[in-house]
Amino acid sequence: MDLNTILIIVGIVALVALIVHGLWSNRREKSKYFDKANKFDRTSLTSRSHTQEEMVQPNNISPNTYVENGHTPISQPTTEKLPSEAELIDYRQSDKSVDDIKISIPNTQPIYDMGNHRSEPIQPTQPQYDMPTANNVASMTLEQLEAQSQNVGFNGINSSSPELRVQLAELSHEEHQVDYNLSFNEPKAETTAQPKQTTGYIQLYLIPKSSEEFNGAKLVQALENLGFILGKDEMYHRHLDLSVASPVLFSVANLEQPGTFNAYNLAEFNTIGIVLFMQLPSPGNNLANLRMMMRAAHTLAEDLQGVILTEEQEIFDANAEQAYLARV
């Protein structure tokens, strides 16, 4: 028999031995498991039923639940879970056991006995405040209250007192109260509205800024650009429809006597100033016509480097303009 055959036989024998050993070990472990399971059912359940039968009797377990041989329990469907051992404690003994408890620290004497102090409930003690009376607080100033709060220390002032709150609020209200009882019966300066001007003339003056005079040719050109037409009484007029046939809104006259413009000598004409005037009542709306005359005066002042004056020969500023508009 050669070496290869011997090795094959030895390997097969070893393999068979391993298989047999594994099966035997598996059966032994399984037998031990089932042995422990049967022993647990037999001892734990039976001992529990004997020790707890005086305390609680399960509703769904009958005395004939187990067979006489005691090997296999007969299981029956139950709707309620069996109470655990923690739930089966006799709570009637809890008060007595609590009384016997003593709390102590190692190497020291017991410092508290639950049984001796059980019948004596601890009464909460309320701190005593050295409070000033409400009348005194009400009469104090803010500085005195702050000093009092510092002197009382940790306890402070009991601001939760309703009476104290009311009196402090009244005191603060009296200190900060402002007398709003104004007398409305006092005579007031009556602002009488200025009566509207319905007749007469409204005038504006335009003069040069320097001592020079207005050049006639430039003046005529500026007037014609604004729609003025030389017409009646040898004056320039601003008509409603820019035609001689339409009504005159306002006019321009020469400040030099006789106040006319020489139509035949305009090239050599010079003047110290002109006056714009509007006769009331004017055609259409007096206020609209006055605004138009004011705009014409401002345009002429820019073109001719002039200054606008009021009827009182004062500078025609924004206030004077509002006063003119208020007249109509």
UniProtKB/Swiss-Prot annotation:
An annotated GO BP: division septum assembly
Cytoplasmic face residues: 26-328
Gene3D superfamilies for the chain: ZipA, C-terminal FtsZ-binding domain
Keywords: Cell cycle, Cell division, Cell inner membrane, Cell membrane, Membrane, Transmembrane, Transmembrane helix
Pfam families: ZipA_C
Membrane association type: Single-pass type I membrane protein
Record topological domains on the Periplasmic side: 1-4
Transmembrane feature ranges: 5-25
NCBIfam families: septum_zipA
HAMAP family assigned: ZipA (MF_00509)
Family: Belongs to the ZipA family.
Protein name: Cell division protein ZipA
Organism: Haemophilus influenzae (strain PittGG)
